[in-house]
């Protein structure tokens, strides 16, 4: 499965548009990691715990996107948009959502 943020794939022709596909992931952040990440951010370092959670959520969302596209018979997803948002009463969860258009292509 190919993924692209662009509306086309260089060197390939889109022969069929299969529909809009989406993938979402919501992950809760551990309170202790949040505490130590906050301390690290105060002293100017990067938060490895947050970066790991973000990467994990993005991978899950893209896996869902690809699975949905494959179920439509597509071999690529174009025009992908990636959104990040904190959710929950206290912003303790991270949501990653991806969407795009599933397509069939040929060279």
UniProtKB/Swiss-Prot annotation:
InterPro entries: UPF0145_dom_sf (IPR035439), UPF0145_YbjQ-like (IPR002765). Belongs to the UPF0145 family. HAMAP family: UPF0145 (MF_00338). This is UPF0145 protein ESA_02470. It comes from Cronobacter sakazakii (strain ATCC BAA-894) (Enterobacter sakazakii).
